[in-house]
């Protein structure tokens, strides 16, 4: 009778000590401004979130579209945020601007109209 009780207690103690510690999560707000761009964003190894920013021409003004996105990151993950022009000749309609803020130190990246893609791909500093 004593051995099974000791065995069960030992298993309970081992199971509770093996509990996986959860990593702290951080919220990050992303913003991309571009004319006719494909936006891709993720944290860590995942690269599967996409959006398209169209923009439009109104009279003699070119209006770039802005997309905002929310991302949840863990401490050891890198931020991946990219916007690439769908049509190479759409560069004449303005720069590509990328920014990230929230529970991280703010990041801003802009590329001139001649560039095809703007990319942020790096480790971030959490607050």
Where are these predicted regions, by residue range?
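A short, solvent-exposed beta-strand micro-motif common in secreted/extracellular proteins
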Residues: 75-88
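Sec-dependent bacterial lipoprotein signal peptides
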Residues: 1-17
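Short, surface-exposed beta-strand/strand-loop-strand elements in extracellular ectodomains
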Residues: 38-49, 92-103
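Bacterial Sec-dependent N-terminal signal peptides
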Residues: 16-34
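Short strand-edge motifs at loop-to-beta-strand transitions and within beta-strands
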Residues: 61, 65-71, 120-122
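Sequence contexts marking disulfide-bonded cysteines in secreted/extracellular proteins
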Residues: 19, 33-38, 83-85, 116-118
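C-terminal partner/receptor-binding element of secreted or periplasmic proteins
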Residues: 105-127
């Amino acid at each position: 009778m004593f051995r099974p009780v000791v065995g069960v207690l030992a298993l309970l103690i081992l199971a509770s000590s093996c509990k996986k510690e959860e990593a702290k999560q951080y919220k990050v707000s992303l913003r991309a401004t571009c004319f006719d761009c494909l936006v891709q964003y993720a944290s860590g190894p995942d690269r599967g979130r996409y959006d398209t920013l169209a923009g439009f021409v109104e009279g003699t003004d070119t209006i770039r579209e802005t997309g905002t996105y929310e991302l949840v990151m863990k401490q050891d993950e890198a931020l991946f945020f990219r916007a690439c022009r769908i049509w190479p000749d759409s560069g004449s309609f303005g720069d590509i601007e990328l920014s990230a803020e929230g529970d991280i130190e703010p990041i801003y990246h802009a590329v001139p109209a001649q560039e095809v893609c703007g990319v942020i791909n790096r480790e971030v500093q959490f607050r």
